[in-house]
């Protein structure tokens, strides 16, 4: 599937973020996340869907924002530095039959484990206790 040829044929739907109230709704309906440095990727990782990180300003960004030393290698998806690279990678991901998602499975799991307490099975009761303390 070639993105440039199919946008006009509506084979690819690009949703306007202003039409949805909650970004979590958008994540459910999205097949892929094109992201930058946003923590949205952490939440999107739970969906097990592919992610691409578009970082055209990376050199400038790291000059004023401190990132983990191994930031790029720990992302749950590939990163690109130009729009052309983005289009090429997006075309490849859309045609690969899930291989891209399988390739980044371990990074995605590590990402989720780093930012979520996935082993906590008492979240509901803790939330209930919290609500009771403020009522």
Regions found by a protein language model. Give the residues of each.
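Donor nucleotide-activated moiety binding/catalytic core segment of transferases
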Residues: 1-42
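Catalytic binding pocket for nucleotide-activated donors in carbohydrate/polymer assembly enzymes
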Residues: 3-10, 39-115
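Short, contiguous acidic/charged loop-to-helix segments that flank catalytic cores in large enzymes
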Residues: 15-22, 74-77, 115-118
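Residues within well-ordered alpha-helical secondary structure of globular protein domains
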Residues: 29-32, 92, 133
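C-terminal alpha-helical cap of glycosyltransferases
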Residues: 117-135
């Amino acid at each position: 599937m070639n993105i440039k040829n199919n946008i006009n044929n509506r084979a690819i739907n690009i949703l306007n973020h202003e039409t949805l109230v909650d970004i979590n709704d958008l994540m459910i309906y999205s097949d892929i996340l094109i992201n930058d440095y946003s923590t949205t990727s952490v939440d999107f990782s739970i969906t097990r869907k592919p992610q691409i990180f578009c970082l055209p300003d990376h050199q400038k960004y790291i000059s004023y924002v401190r990132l983990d030393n191994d930031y790029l290698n720990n992302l749950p998806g590939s990163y690109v530095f130009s729009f052309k690279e983005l289009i090429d990678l997006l075309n490849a991901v859309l045609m690969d039959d899930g291989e891209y998602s399988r390739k980044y499975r371990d990074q995605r799991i590590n990402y989720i484990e780093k930012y979520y307490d996935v082993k906590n099975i008492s979240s509901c009761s803790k939330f209930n206790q919290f609500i009771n303390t403020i009522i």
